[in-house]
Structures are given as structure tokens and as C-alpha cells.
């Protein structure tokens, strides 16, 4: 993995903690063709998610708040994250995916990440 956990004085403690959690979690989470990995990427403004088959290295479905489908959606960031979860569930089901392994990428399971997972579950994906 290309994640550096060096003691750079310019790296915030919160970022170091997230990277440490990401490395620990990534050791245990792997996507297969039967249960691909649902990867969450969160920034301060947007959230994106991909359904990835790690054995082939292929993205099966994806969704993001930066898409034209969600640009006009009014609501706070948590509501948009839930909508992204529902959208990726719809796209994954059309690609033939029923169950996924949730990879929060070191983010805490709280707020927007939890809302995205809830939206994906309501969309029909099983974790």
C-alpha cells in the first residue's frame, strides 16, 4: 500500500488516526466477485462510493455527490450521502451485485458514512 504513516509535523493528528484505521481495516477487508467491496471516499464537501472486485481490480458501480443526478438535490450533506447510497445500490443491483463488504476507508462509522450505508441497505444491498 502506498500510505505513509511517517511522523511529518505538518500532518494533522486526525489525518494520522484516519490513515492508521485505514491500514488496519484494509488488512481485513477484501472484495470477491460474489461480495465486492463498497469503498467510501469522503471529503469536506463531497462523498463518493465505488463497488470494487479486488480479484480482478475492476469497479462494478459507482456514485458521487458530484454527479449531475445529485447536483440539483437540495438537502444537507448527510441527506445527499444517503441519496448516494441509494443510487449506488440501484447501480450495483443492475450490475448483478446483491451483497457487499463495507469498507469505510478509515472514516468513523458516523454521520455521512453511516447515512450512506443506511441508504445502500434501503436500496437493497446486504452487508
Swiss-Prot record:
Superkingdom field: Bacteria
Keywords: Ribonucleoprotein, Ribosomal protein, RNA-binding, rRNA-binding
CDD domains: Ribosomal_L18_L5e
Pfam family, one: Ribosomal_L18p
InterPro entries associated with the record: Ribosomal_uL18_bac-type, Ribosomal_uL18_bac/euk
GO molecular function terms listed in the Swiss-Prot or TrEMBL record: 5S rRNA binding; structural constituent of ribosome
Listed GO CC annotations: cytosolic large ribosomal subunit
Biased composition, class Basic residues, residue ranges: 11-29
Residue ranges, annotated region (Disordered): 1-34
Compositionally biased residues, Polar residues: 1-10
Oligomer status and interactors: Part of the 50S ribosomal subunit; part of the 5S rRNA/L5/L18/L25 subcomplex. Contacts the 5S and 23S rRNAs.
Function: This is one of the proteins that bind and probably mediate the attachment of the 5S RNA into the large ribosomal subunit, where it forms part of the central protuberance.
Family assignment from sequence similarity: Belongs to the universal ribosomal protein uL18 family.
UniProt name for this protein: Large ribosomal subunit protein uL18
Gene source species: Nocardioides sp. (strain ATCC BAA-499 / JS614)
Taxon lineage: Bacteria, Bacillati, Actinomycetota, Actinomycetes, Propionibacteriales
